[in-house]
Amino acid sequence: MPDILIIAGPTGVGKSGAAVLVAEEIDGENVSADSRQVYRGLVIGTAAPSPQLQKRVPHHLINERDPREVWSAGAFASEAAGTIEDIIARGRRPLVVGGSGFYIRALTEGLFEEPPADPGERRRIRARLRSRLEKEGSGALHDELARCDPEWARAVAEADSQRILRGLEVYELHGVPLTDLQEERQSNPPIVARWCTVLLERDRKDLYDRLNARVERLLDAGWLGEARSLMSAKVPADAPGLTGLGYDLLFDHLLGRISFDDTVEGIKQEHRNYAKRQLSWFRAMDAHRIRLEPQDGPEKTAGLILDAWHRHRKP
């Protein structure tokens, strides 16, 4: 059974740079467990590892899928398991790196198996929910989700119509919250390993300060131009790859609906909200928790991760 390291933590905590240093130390390759970095054309806005970092260490599941495609936890778990097996077969060590606690759970524990339901009833519910989404918007449906499955709603962005509809569909079909079914009906994980999960944490003020600075940095790096290119390619603002990170606000700004200053402040708020949702998944995660200080950079972080890894591997 292989030992596999997972480096987890909310967006902006400092995973990418440290993960490259760790991979260089243990002859590893990084497998992204990020629900947005997998999409093509979102390199700047998702703060994907830079080309310089990717030259130093091979990265997988980054910049691979069309942003119009649905990329689910199940798809990630299957792809990641195959990638991990290939890395091991080549004599190297896989590192799973990312901020999606749901994706990490799907890989390490498996996904829930939904009880059977009448296909016709499922189609009717799905069509009715989609019609409501078009008429009422995702915010109204998110409010409804919060009433029937508050735990799932806390982990889902208000703009993430795909996951909102999924939660409401399951509740209408079975009368049980999706999160309850996930606890009761786990399937087998796609790969069996001795997982060493290291969770990076920061004081909330420190994390939010880092996120605010990151948004400014991404805009300076050309994020608005990246959004303009997506618009030119006819990628809609509600495409699966664009939810919850600020692309919708950049689209609104490019269409003259919102000022640049309001766009920037709105994006910063979206990033803080996204980090809150990630943290809700991490609270219950079984992991080696590393509390980082504001001055801790990639080198210090990598050293702490390696200490946890070496302790994990001791007989």
Language-model regions, residue ranges each:
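Phosphate/pyrophosphate-binding catalytic cores of soluble transferases and nucleic-acid-acting enzymes
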Residues: M1-P315
